[in-house]
Amino acid sequence: MYSVFANIRTVGDFFRSIKWAWQRATKGYCDLDAYGVGDWFLNTLPDMLESIKNNRVGFPSVLLEEGMEHYGLKSMDEYNAASEELRNKIDDYGNEKWGEILSEMIFLLREANEDTCSKVNPYEEEYRRVSEEFRKKYGEWGEKLLTEEEKAKAKKSGSHPIYLPSHLPEYKEIIELYLEEEYKISEYQAKCKDKALEMFSKWFDSLWV
């Protein structure tokens, strides 16, 4: 679980962190968690599943049945009558499969989280560079690109058109490449989240140590 003390900068932050820690201790969650349940889920669940995986002492019965089928047994009577060596093989099969299932859920949830996703936008560094260059040359919102007519209108209305790096030919290509890659990464993260939730629902009753 991510710490409530992670971003303390002021006295107010400190006292809020104490409050959140008390809320977690007394009711299992705090206001910070409720501000973003999705973030809480993606930050917390992988570590919980990791704990289940590392401390498990059994596996779902359906995986025992799968192991029996794998080794040609059709009933619990046959399993009970089998040699100890064969029963151990079946148990090892189920335990290994359960570990793989938990590992896959952990992986998918971490990939769905933008803070832990393995996918990196190859244009990130260049995007940051041109964004900073644009800001220094033309202002935060492209104020230095305003025409005289736009400046005159801005004096009357109190607002002016906003210009972004993508509006200039020199930056347009890298911005488009960056945004296209961001879209691909977002799609990938969404698919990982959906698959993880599907698995979470399927194995919900088996998620215990």
Predicted stretch roles:
Residues 1-204:
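Long, non-globular targeting/processing and low-complexity regions
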